[in-house]
Each structure stands twice: as structure tokens, then as C-alpha cells.
């Protein structure tokens, strides 16, 4: 472990280096917060890992290992250097149109790739804090905790997931009587 690089409500992300391969990885440490059982938490992580272990797209990260040790879960994944779009907007404000269009094209390509997987994967938490801008200018879509494989037999998923303000209004019951139609 080289350094702490991020912290969220339930997790800490570290930068680590594999000495044998001389490769940097991100290691997400997730402790059971008492609100969710470790079993439920592990199931969600396994779902995320199973989705990401099968991807091969430049905008999508890879998960290489999940370790469950004494109630703490460690997820080893690609280390993505850079800022999130949210961080960039806070620091610099509005970005040039050409750059934003390029980011949009890259993200659309990643979503198209996910939707064409078998089974299709639905990414359900698109927001500026879940898109990393790499130093060379490309983007990476992160945080697949709410992503889901589409089940054709179960198209009546009523689970509200995502982030208020970024998710569809009907996810949080905010759309009744609103809209232009």
C-alpha cells in the first residue's frame, strides 16, 4: 500500500503496487457498516466484479480480485489516475464544448458496449463524480455498485437506485404531474 487516494461513506481506496509485476492497482477496502450484512455487501461486490471481470473496453475499469478477510472486503482493480469530472468542474468551471462532446462520445461507446454484452448490463449511476478524466484526456466510468445485468424475464424492477438529481425522476417518485407531456 502506497497511499490513501479516496474515501467514501463505506470505503477507503488505496493506491498499491504489485512488486512482482511493477504495476499499480487501486485497492478498495470496505468495512461492514452494521447497516448491511457482510453477506449482502459481498453479494453486491461479487455482482460488480462479475460484470467488470468480463469487460474489455478502454472506458471501463477491470476488477482483478476480491478478498474477504475478517469482515473486511478488499477489491483490487485498475488504478485510474486523474480527477473526476465533478472535481474538474469545481476547479475550473465549464469545460470547452469539444472536450465535453469527446467525453460524451467515449461514455456513449462504453454504455453501448455494456448494453451489447450477453446479458446486457445496465449502468444506473451516471453522474460527474463517477467519471474519471485520465491525464491523457480519456475518461473512465467508475462505480458499478448499482449496475445490473438485464433480465428479460424480470423487466419490472422497482428498486430505486442511483443518485437523486441524476437518476430519472420516476426512480424517486418525483415525476408525478411533471414534464411537458
Please describe what each predicted stretch is.
Residues 66:
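Activation-segment/catalytic-loop signature of the eukaryotic protein kinase fold
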Residues 70-84, 88:
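Conserved short submotifs of the Hanks-type protein kinase catalytic core
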Residues 31-54:
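AlphaC helix of the eukaryotic protein kinase fold
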Residues 103-104:
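Activation segment signature within eukaryotic-like protein kinase domains
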Residues 157-170:
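Conserved activation segment of eukaryotic-like protein kinases, specifically the C-terminal portion
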Residues 109-121:
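Protein kinase catalytic-loop region centered on the HRD/HxD motif
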Residues 2-8, 13:
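Protein kinase glycine-rich loop
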